[in-house]
Curated annotation (Swiss-Prot):
Disulfide bonds: none annotated. It comes from Verminephrobacter eiseniae (strain EF01-2). It holds the Pfam family Ribosomal_S9. InterPro entries: Ribosomal_Su5_D2-typ_SF (IPR020568), Ribosomal_uS9 (IPR000754), Ribosomal_uS9_bac/plastid (IPR023035), Ribosomal_uS9_CS (IPR020574), Ribsml_uS5_D2-typ_fold_subgr (IPR014721). GO terms for biological process: translation. Keywords: Ribonucleoprotein, Ribosomal protein. Belongs to the universal ribosomal protein uS9 family. GO terms for cellular component: cytosolic small ribosomal subunit. It comes from the Bacteria. This is Small ribosomal subunit protein uS9.
Length: 130
């Protein structure tokens, strides 16, 4: 399996995606389901496919993705990051174009923790003058 598959691990928020790609017809499977049935929103599907569209490999690879943690948006971002890394593993010449588009860099933004004495991470209790 390792010989014919290229792999990459992508992360976004609290989601982690392990991506495996090989030459094929363009079928993307996430956790055993087709990408159309796994992601409800068209934007999530578009986000996950961005690196393939940029490098003109939309119908070149069959992709298998195992993703866990987080929500739909985070999982789509993790899948995009993983596909990017797998494409670089396949052909290092694609890295400059993917890097220029900002797909290689891991988006380090995480949810800020809630602090004691506040409603949320930054929202303070309502001030009462009297």
């Amino acid at each position: 399996m390792i010989g014919q598959w290229n792999n990459g691990t992508g992360r976004r928020k609290s989601s982690v995606a392990r991506v495996f790609l090989k030459k094929g017809s363009g079928k993307i499977t996430i956790n055993g389901k087709d990408i159309q049935s796994y992601f409800g929103r068209e934007t999530s599907i578009m986000i996950a496919r961005q690196p393939l569209a940029l490098t003109n490999h939309v119908e070149t690879f069959d992709i298998r993705i195992n993703v866990y943690g987080g929500g739909e948006s985070g999982q789509a971002g993790a899948a995009r990051h993983g596909i990017t890394r797998a494409l670089i593993d396949y052909d290092a010449a694609l890295k400059p174009a993917l890097s220029q588009a900002g797909f290689v860099t891991r988006d380090a933004r995480e949810v800020e923790r809630k602090k004691v004495g506040l409603h949320s991470a930054r929202r303070a209790k309502q001030f009462s003058k009297r």
